[in-house]
Amino acid sequence: MDNHPWLPNISRIKDMLREIGVDDVEQLFQDVPRDLILRRELKVGYDSPLPEEDIRWRLNQVAERNLKLRYPPFLGAGAYPHSIPSVIRFILSRSEFYTAYTPYQPEVNQGLLQGLFEYQSLMAELLEMDVVNSSHYDWGGSLAEAVLMGYRINGKRKVVIPESINPLHEEVLRTWVSGRELEVVKIPVGKDGKIDLDFLSSLNSDEISSIYIQQPNFFGVVETELEYVTDWARKNNVVSIMGVSPLSLGLIKTPGELGFDIAVGDGQELGIPLNFGGPYSGILATRMDMKLVRQMPGRIVGMTQDSQGRRGFTLILQTREQFARREKATSNITTNEALIALANAVYLSLLGKEGIRELATEIYKRSHYALKRMEDEELGKRKWESDFFEEFTFVFRSDYDRIHSELLRRGIHGGLRLGPREALFCVTEVHTKRAIDDLVNAMKEVA
């Protein structure tokens, strides 16, 4: 290892490597694929610092390499373009809130604690669930935590998920449960794009710890007859988990109404911009059953009174958490997405119940308009005839790679490629009629 001006203590590094029985630093990264390892020396810290104007110029040069789009991307699959009220950014920028760290000291954090309490209350109302924590990192993490809750409650070692799950969420889940040696079983998808409910009868429920359903599913299809799933789970001592798009609840049944034990999701749709994958916020909620609540990881803010009878907010049930009792903690999560959760609370407060319903209706109308235009122009057909929300899977008559490349050349980002002729399109309230028409017309010219 060569000396570096920022890392001068080479002898100490060698001592540490010797202590853990490693010859060099590279051995610590053997699990990283070889083609991802940088083979040249990274020239950082050798030259004298640049003036501010030079730094700004260099960063602008890098930014110029970004693709300039005429319209918001028609790309969803877990991250969605939505209109964000400007007041959200203003509130988040206030110094009292501008931190993502947990407010451990209630005597100096009443503002942020109340903001998180309002987030929990608003989210509980939206989901029609009883208890909501003050956020996780993202949807995948919340799902994994919910599955581990189920395992701790009943001790069974199989987890049932649908084939129509977001593949990134599945990767996170499989990584988390591998340490507990839990087995993941998939429910097949039928010809209508929905889960095959008959498959449940073939399962040995004595082995099933939890069952997870995504609504709408990864392909945008709205699942139906979910009461059958919750009834089956309740009769067989299986923890039922529903992953849900928050904005879809303006039109479809909530997890609470359907009788699910746990609800998970992502707050990205609620006032958070697209930003190279994050930060977003993971939603985790349960019904009021202390068997569930005691196993719920993450921070929970409660309202109480101080010794003088004044209303106050503080973290509650902290013995569930690893900083309180590490060896018996429900999770190793040590913080949350407080700032993002606050943005979610502001967004929900601004829209209210009617606003959420109107927005969901507008998204529904625009996405169905886009599909109709694509079918009217005989570009292909939708893969499933079932109803959908916000996203739909389209099967083209010709090669989608060529279509997508041409769209990018024209400053339009199409849907997510699922196969040689298949793509998943997302349409929300930010996609105007003109944007949709231009998308369809461009595809018609090159299809």
UniProtKB/Swiss-Prot annotation:
InterPro entries: GcvPA, GDC-P_N, GDC_P, PyrdxlP-dep_Trfase, PyrdxlP-dep_Trfase_major, PyrdxlP-dep_Trfase_small. Its EC number is 1.4.4.2. Disulfide bonds: none annotated. Pfam families: GDC-P. Keywords: Oxidoreductase. One of its GO terms (molecular function) is glycine dehydrogenase (decarboxylating) activity. Gene3D superfamilies: Aspartate Aminotransferase, domain 1, Type I PLP-dependent aspartate aminotransferase-like (Major domain). GO terms for biological process: glycine decarboxylation via glycine cleavage system; nucleoside metabolic process. Belongs to the GcvP family. N-terminal subunit subfamily. The glycine cleavage system is composed of four proteins: P, T, L and H. In this organism, the P 'protein' is a heterodimer of two subunits. This is Probable glycine dehydrogenase (decarboxylating) subunit 1.
